[in-house]
Amino acid sequence: MAHHKSAKKRIRQTERRTEVNRARVSRIRTYVKKVELAIAGGDSAAAQAALQEAQPELMKGAQAGILHKNTASRKVSRLVARVKEMKSLA
């Protein structure tokens, strides 16, 4: 257990940041899941709309330091490719 005032403060800050980051990660996963469900369902319009919502969330996560920027870009790229492939098959 921390005894110094500054160490106690750091613990409080870490707990707050952990909560915020956990919420952000959950939000990102939810948006990505919506895209994947739309792709699995075969609904290209819904997949495109979900992708338009998921892309900014992923990039905001990268900007906030939750995801590495390359990871966010890779996820966006793969989702875009899957939606594009789905459109071409339909």
Curated annotation (Swiss-Prot):
Keyword terms of this UniProt record: Ribonucleoprotein, Ribosomal protein, RNA-binding, rRNA-binding
Chain residue ranges for the region called Disordered: 1-22
Compositionally biased spans, kind Basic residues: 1-11
GO molecular function, one term: small ribosomal subunit rRNA binding
UniProt keyword ATP-binding present: no
HAMAP family recorded: Ribosomal_bS20
Protein name: Small ribosomal subunit protein bS20
Upper classification of the organism: Bacteria, Pseudomonadati, Pseudomonadota, Alphaproteobacteria, Rhodospirillales
